[in-house]
């Protein structure tokens, strides 16, 4: 049967990150997995620490839920209109990394998007990573912070092609670039994200109309982990 490995991330800076991750899991699994025909749900992380997530979601059974052993795993079974929903009793969690990124700078939209789609497919094929944006590509790459106090991120004006003339010398967009696409890579550890980054670069580098591959470096505001896009002698920092 087809399956999918899914990762959920919450920012480390949240003081309630453990509780926030559990809430996110409960909402996503109940709305998007429990409701989907023929699905079951299992945890890839065994041992401590863990959430008793299966028990909480099993309350959907309204008293008809029961514990069992299926596929040599301790699970909760929930009777549903489509048959049964099976879910592991415990779901483990651990530290990971968010926010590895690549920028694909193209002569026009088609070139940038074509390169980004190639990069996204290659990165997504790397075990242990996810690309959290639709199709793996973000057209609205952002900077940390905003002139508005209620916003935590905003458009990166210095790299917007349509703002080149308005910003004048403040524009940081290289000559000839007409569009910038970004891919974001989250993963289980730095080495895994680095491997996905290199796979993405190899897949995209020969795209016609691709002028540059770079990455967002936000002055250390997004984290202390760095992935180098090039070997010694020409390093470019990508924050995670």
Describe these PLM feature segments.
Residues 1-6:
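An N-terminus-focused feature that recognizes amino-terminal "leader" regions
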């Amino acid at each position: 049967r087809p399956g999918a490995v899914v990762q959920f991330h919450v920012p480390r800076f949240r003081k309630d990150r453990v509780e926030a991750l559990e809430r996110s899991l409960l909402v996503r699994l109940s709305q998007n997995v429990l409701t989907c025909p023929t699905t079951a749900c299992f945890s890839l992380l065994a041992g401590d620490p863990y959430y008793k997530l299966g028990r909480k979601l099993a309350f959907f059974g309204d008293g008809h839920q029961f514990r069992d052993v299926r596929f040599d795993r301790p699970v909760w079974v929930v009777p549903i209109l489509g048959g049964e929903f099976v879910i592991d009793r415990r779901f483990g969690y651990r530290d990971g990394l968010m926010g590895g990124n690549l920028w694909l700078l193209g002569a026009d939209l088609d070139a940038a998007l074509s390169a980004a789609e190639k990069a996204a497919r290659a990165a997504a094929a790397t075990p242990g990573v996810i690309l959290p944006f639709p199709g793996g590509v973000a057209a609205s790459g952002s900077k940390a912070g905003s002139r508005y106090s209620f916003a935590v991120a905003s458009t990166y004006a210095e790299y917007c092609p349509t703002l080149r003339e308005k910003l004048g010398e403040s524009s940081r967009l290289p000559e000839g670039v007409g569009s910038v696409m970004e891919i974001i890579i989250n993963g289980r550890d730095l080495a895994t994200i680095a491997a996905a980054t290199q796979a993405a670069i190899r897949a995209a580098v020969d795209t016609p109309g691709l002028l540059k591959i770079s990455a967002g470096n936000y002055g250390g505001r997004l984290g202390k982990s760095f992935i180098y896009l090039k070997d010694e002698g020409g390093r470019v920092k990508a924050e995670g």
